[in-house]
Design a protein with these regions (language model features):
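Short beta->alpha junction loops
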Residues: 1-5
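Alpha-helical cap/lid subdomain in secreted, periplasmic
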Residues: 8-134, 185-189, 194, 198-261
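Beta-strand-rich recognition domains
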Residues: 130, 134-189, 241-262
Length: 262
């Protein structure tokens, strides 16, 4: 989904798995800015797909300066012994060798133009050809331990939340990290909520933003170095109840993660 983080995909991966794909490409290298919870989310995606019998290929792109979230994603790909195509590095190498210019590849600072997509497709097909020529005799085994902390190896998703008469949702969970995903629209409204952990307001999120893309956003609500029991609460911001239809459109979901413990 355009303009989203790998943490958004945590909420969509099971829907994708219903299609029973043989292979998925994960492309978040120019969207994820590199925060801890996003590298945890990316590893959670890789592990979940592999655990469900779907193979994974990591795609790395870059901005016009050659930058992306290369470090963490490369480390995860190597750790899980899955293919990684660093298209961004290939693009920058071609530019350094004067084979083409950035504007020949992209229409702006990051998005490929038609010729750029053709270049990407050619490189992916080359990877397929290489894979078919290489004989693989060993069966794939998923690592027993995570590359990083494994916070989203066992993700619990809370969806279709039920609010009480005061439009408050409360739940107690043993966790170390909590993310919230929600819809945001450019259509003007005053629907907003506070998300609290153990009585402390962590985030205030709004359904409206004038520059919204009318898609789903994700926020890291809470992260701790050690898992424990916590009370998570969603309530109207400022004590003012929201329109029920707008609250339904908001469609807030929670992702509950927990560090793997010995």
């Amino acid at each position: 989904v355009s303009g989203t983080f790998s943490a958004n995909a945590l909420f969509a991966m099971d829907e994708l798995l219903q299609k029973k794909p043989d292979l998925v490409f994960l492309d978040y290298s120019v969207n994820d800015p590199g925060q801890y919870y996003l590298q945890e989310a990316f590893e959670g995606l890789v592990h979940h797909f592999l655990e469900n019998g779907t193979y994974v290929c990591v795609l790395l792109f870059c901005n016009q300066n050659g930058n992306c979230t290369r470090g963490a994603m490369t480390r995860i790909a190597h750790y899980y012994h899955i293919p990684l195509l660093d298209i961004g590095s290939v693009v920058m190498e071609n530019i350094r060798e004067n084979r083409f210019l950035w504007q020949d590849y992209a229409s702006d600072y990051v998005h490929p133009r038609i010729e750029g997509h053709e270049f990407i497709a050619d490189n992916i097909m080359h990877c397929f050809q290489y894979a078919m020529e290489k004989e693989e005799t060993n069966s794939y085994i998923i690592p027993e331990n995570p590359c990083f902390d494994g916070s989203f190896w066992k993700l619990e998703k809370l969806e279709n939340l039920s609010y009480d008469d005061d439009q408050v949702f409360t739940v107690d969970k043993y966790c170390s990290v909590v993310v919230a995903e929600y819809f945001q629209t450019a259509q003007e409204n005053d629907c907003k909520v506070e998300i609290l952990v153990d009585g402390e307001v962590k985030e205030c999120v709004e359904l409206h933003w004038e520059f919204a893309w009318d898609n789903r956003l994700v926020r890291m609500i809470f992260v701790e170095p050690k898992a424990d029991w916590h009370t998570i609460e969603i309530r109207p911001a400022g004590g003012k109840q929201n329109d029920q239809e707008l609250l339904k459109q908001f469609d807030i979901k929670l992702g509950i993660g927990c560090l793997l413990e010995d």
